Amino acid sequence: QRQMCIRDSLVTALSAATVFSGCNKKVDYDVDGDGSSENSGSGDSGALASRLGIPESYEGDIEVGDSGLKSIKIKDDDISIPSSDSMSIINYKSNTFDNAYKQKVCEAVFDKSKGIYVYDWEHQTKSDLQSQIDSFQAMLEEAKASGDTETESYCNEYISYLEDEMTNATDERTGAGDYSATDFIGNIGDYEYMLSFSDSEEGLGANFELSYYPSEGLINYKPHEGATYVYAYDAQYGDEDVDESMPNSCTFTQDEAVSLAQEFLSSCGIDDVIPTYTSQLLWEYYDTSYDVVATEYDGYIMTFGRSVNGTAPYSADLSMVDSLSSDDDVWYDSTSETFTIQVDSNGVINASCYPLLAPTGDEQKNVELMSWKDLLSALNKNVPAYYTENKTSYNDIEYNDVRLTYYCMKDESQENIYQYVPVWIFAQADEEDGTYDYDYPVQAIMVLSLI
């Protein structure tokens, strides 16, 4: 089976010394960097571009060599660089959740005066089961009214199962205690929510989720006449027939929603983040036949990324990049810390947080960076060599997304240590309906910017 982690794949890394990193293979493309280097020392904001000779825009060709390509071009009208005047290498370690952290998050999110309880998936309380029975009973009534015999049969069967479970269910939930559990129930305002924590003893897996409880009862949180189910999601992925001119009924503005989300993350001990995406929150209502009966905008969905000295690291989905090796012994992987928050008129109602890393406090400040002149020289020497060995279905490549940013890489010399390092990204996003989705490039190379 092809071993490739598609979620946030790592492509080519061309650097002044080594270049390509897969989890199980390493291929070197020597870049001599025979020109002079610039020191990215302290200075005024914006001095980084001046010191390294980085233009605001660039259009030019890269040699094709023996790659078989007809052309390799760079064409970007707005080259992106950090607003700071220097860059660093910052060390992080793989994150895990101890009991104290879970307690901190639960007490920050839930109303402590109403109690915080352990949720046991295998031993639910009578109130847990009754909530589910109530939800399925409502679905059953809708199914009967609409003549949906299939849904009616399913609801009857599942309600019967839940009623049988009631026989051995406990009357009361168990308190959170020492917070050694992984799932907790608590109140936000008048509604119950669940917080679920997960991490991994090996690799990177620390994450927690906040969701309405029970999830199938979300229609009780936001009822609508004739609707049995409701789902809330990013309006960008709504059907084409959704009326985009609908007003957003959220009592918060978009900026206020972003601030609420940042306050939520800060209360969970997550401060070094930067907003990377915001969209309207679309609520879609369905009847028992899963036909849409209504839609509305109420709130916003926001994604934050790790902030590295005020810069959001590169985290595009590179699954469309066909020059990645498909060898069985190569696994491309990278670390993408994302924090997605939903806010409606009641505040934060859903969160999916991946604080995969924790800072170690170690930082190499003011690292020396490759000049733009040396970078172009390195590209002309090594990009043809890369495409000679790693074939693509494209005949012509045009990098239209050029940026100097940070990228997270594993420090192979230390156990469980990761580094955010300065890199150049040269990526190509194809045009679709007059727009370019730079989060899903079709070509990409990465150049370590260190001398």
Residue ranges and their predicted role:
Residues Q1-I6:
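Short, small-residue-biased leader/transition segments that mark boundaries at the very start
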Residues S413-V423, A429-I451:
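C-terminal soluble interaction/assembly domains
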